[in-house]
Regions:
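Active-site-adjacent substrate-binding region
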Residues: 102-210
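Solvent-exposed loop/turn segments at secondary-structure junctions
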Residues: 11-13, 24-28, 68-73, 98-103, ...
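Low-complexity, Pro/Thr/Ser/Gly/Ala-rich linker/spacer regions in secreted
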Residues: 207-220
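Short beta-strand/loop motifs in extracellular/secreted proteins, especially
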Residues: 16, 60, 241-245
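Short beta-strand element of the alpha/beta-hydrolase
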Residues: 17-21
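C-terminal outer-membrane/trafficking sorting elements
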Residues: 217-258
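A non-catalytic alpha/beta surface segment that caps or lines the substrate-entry region
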Residues: 1-8
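Acidic/histidine-rich catalytic neighborhood of metal-dependent amide-processing enzymes
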Residues: 1, 28-118
């Protein structure tokens, strides 16, 4: 029933928090509960997001969570969200990670975004970020009545939390069974990757990248013209021999390499 919490303190607004969470417990009606999709995929997304973003500093603090006992009533996340509200923590957004590895055969990768209308601003924010990085991907707001997840614990405490889900109609038929395994239940690593990429994009954008955490030492002998540039950029280096250039976005994505 334990929760595991990791905090990256913000450099400018340490008392404003962006929270990224998942549940680490698994449940099965048959006794065997491997939990590959529900919810190893969500935990993996949180860990990978933390790994990538740990290389940078952000103006707001980021909290990474792995909650216990979600399957028996959101126990771990309820306790934590209740505590956050009790001490007056300013959580600007919660991003839930729960089941992102099953793609219904024949479907294209998409995201079903679950949230109540009361937190529509963060739902709109998620869709706007998706439109920037993956404009071809469908993201649809849905109301899911057949189950619940840890975002609700934050919503009930007045925080804005959303739940990107694999498919509210055609989610893995193998969850809560001994067949929740890689293969039948987690059948699309590409979809898990896409959900994790969206996690990284949304968390890092809302947390506000601290530009000072991006080292410019290596650029001291390189000039750029014009700066900023729109269509054409000329780089001049004092280094002789072969030079390798990478253009990297603020989210750590390699945009161009030559």
């Amino acid at each position: 029933f334990h929760n595991y919490i990791g905090v990256m303190k913000g450099s400018k607004y340490p008392d404003e928090y962006v929270v990224c969470g998942s549940h680490l417990d698994s449940y099965s009606y048959s006794g065997m509960c491997p939990g590959a999709d529900d919810n190893a995929t969500g935990v993996a997304s949180v860990i990978e997001t933390a790994r990538i973003l740990s290389q940078y500093s952000f103006e707001r603090s980021i909290i990474y969570c792995a909650f216990g006992a979600e399957e028996i009533g959101l126990v771990g996340s309820s306790a934590y969200a209740d505590y956050c509200a009790e001490v007056g923590m300013n959580i600007v957004g919660y991003f839930n990670n729960d089941m992102n590895g099953y793609l219904n055969p024949g479907d294209e990768i998409h995201i079903d975004l679950i949230y109540p209308n009361s937190v529509a601003p963060i739902g709109d924010y998620y869709m706007n970020v998706a439109n920037v990085y993956f404009p071809e991907m469908q993201v649809r707001h849905v109301n899911f009545q057949a189950g619940d997840s840890d975002h609700t614990s934050f919503n009930l405490n007045g925080y804005m939390g959303i739940y990107p889900f694999e498919d509210y109609q055609n989610y893995s038929p193998y969850i809560h069974t001994g067949n929740d395994l890689i293969g039948p239940s987690v059948n699309s690593f590409e979809m898990s990757q896409r959900y994790t990429q969206m996690n990284v994009a949304c968390v890092s954008t809302l947390a506000l990248l601290d530009s000072e955490s991006v080292s410019e030492n290596e650029m001291s002998s390189v000039t750029m013209f014009p700066n900023p540039a729109q269509n054409t950029l000329e780089l001049t280096s004092e280094y002789s021999g072969n030079n390798k250039v990478q253009i990297i976005s603020s989210l750590g994505q390699i945009v161009k390499e030559f």
